[in-house]
Amino acid sequence: MSGFLPFSRPAMGVEELAAVKEVLESGWITTGPKNQALEQAFCQLTGNQHAIAVSSATAGMHITLMALEIGKGDEVITPSLTWVSTLNMISLLGATPVMVDVDRDTLMVTPEVIEAAITPRTKAIIPVHYAGAPADIDAIRAIGERYGIAVIEDAAHAVGTYYKGRHIGAKGTAIFSFHAIKNITCAEGGLIVTDNENLARQLRMLKFHGLGVDAYDRHTWGRAPQAEVLTPGYKYNLTDINAAIALTQLVKLEHLNTRRREIAQQYQQALAALPFQPLSLPAWPHVHAWHLFIIRVDEQRCGISRDALMEALKEIGIGTGLHFRAAHTQKYYRERFPTLSLPNTEWNSERICSLPLFPDMTTADADRVITALQQLAGQ
């Protein structure tokens, strides 16, 4: 048997090592010029006026919700089929997450479902660009504008995703992730883009103790060392060590995503003859970033359950992932919302499985996964 093939592996090389070495030798290793360069590069990528680097996408979600003054008595619409950090941040601020169902085959929330969930207490809508494909964001933003509700795009899967010719986040507010399995990574990190100048100013304060400037800003421009606290804030800044890695990865983005796309196409061609169901692609014009390649394993159709398939693949050295278990089935949220029923979400949550997909995979690696799936399907 070949060595273990993980579900994901970061694509790191000599360029990232050199970038880290440069920062370590510079004398300034925390938030500084590499953060500024990363923010500028993201504005060029998405076309937004402002970018705010943070220590994680979760941190970005937290301070974005705070900056929008979301709290007790407010409701925030979000799919249940998402990572629980979004639900956690909403709940920790005292607001109520209103979990809605997704399309059965794209796993993304639809404008119709969002609009049906709006009440006088709705303060924000958080659509997820799932697995690297874009949600129908124009239609969702139109709903937000019509009702006066903020739209926060969960773009954790969407670095390199385009919707109708525009990069995700363009002309809106979106939060990206640089976690270890994402399309670009710096181990841990995130970034918010927005065209709202007041929101950007609030985010910069909230990410760094509520100060109007950070330490590098004071050091560079010779401002008074005793900075003023303008509002209570957090310690969510990104170090320049991390920013340097993310910046180097961003330069490679087109190459990294091209390789992901090639592997995804290899899977798609093979799955056409197998009972495992991949996700459907959105109907609107888009460029898929292929953050994840997800199949649905229905036991009646496939002759094997999802959990049994994942275990069988593990036994022959192939890793898989689960993105995601529905949040409303987690203990805390199950007890808080005991009567909530989301049929499409629940059907998929019990069947989805993420196959290995990362830029350093070889064609032989993908063939190995395909052969294993063929054998497990009895072919």
Swiss-Prot record:
CDD domains: AHBA_syn
GO function term, MF aspect, one: pyridoxal phosphate binding
Gene Ontology annotations of biological process type: lipid A biosynthetic process; lipopolysaccharide biosynthetic process; response to antibiotic
Modified residue annotations for N6-(pyridoxal phosphate)lysine: K182
The protein's required cofactors: pyridoxal 5'-phosphate
UniProt-listed Enzyme Commission number(s): 2.6.1.87
Pfam families in UniProt: DegT_DnrJ_EryC1
Keyword Lipid metabolism: yes
Catalytic activity: UDP-4-amino-4-deoxy-beta-L-arabinose + 2-oxoglutarate = UDP-beta-L-threo-pentopyranos-4-ulose + L-glutamate
Domain of life of the source: Bacteria
GO cellular component term of the entry, any: membrane
Keywords: Aminotransferase, Antibiotic resistance, Lipid A biosynthesis, Lipid biosynthesis, Lipid metabolism, Lipopolysaccharide biosynthesis, Pyridoxal phosphate, Transferase
Pathway info: Nucleotide-sugar biosynthesis; UDP-4-deoxy-4-formamido-beta-L-arabinose biosynthesis; UDP-4-deoxy-4-formamido-beta-L-arabinose from UDP-alpha-D-glucuronate: step 2/3; Bacterial outer membrane biogenesis; lipopolysaccharide biosynthesis
Enzyme class name: transferase
Quaternary structure and interacting proteins, as annotated: Homodimer.
Protein family (similarity comment): Belongs to the DegT/DnrJ/EryC1 family. ArnB subfamily.
Described purpose of this protein according to its UniProt entry: Catalyzes the conversion of UDP-4-keto-arabinose (UDP-Ara4O) to UDP-4-amino-4-deoxy-L-arabinose (UDP-L-Ara4N). The modified arabinose is attached to lipid A and is required for resistance to polymyxin and cationic antimicrobial peptides.
Name of protein: UDP-4-amino-4-deoxy-L-arabinose--oxoglutarate aminotransferase
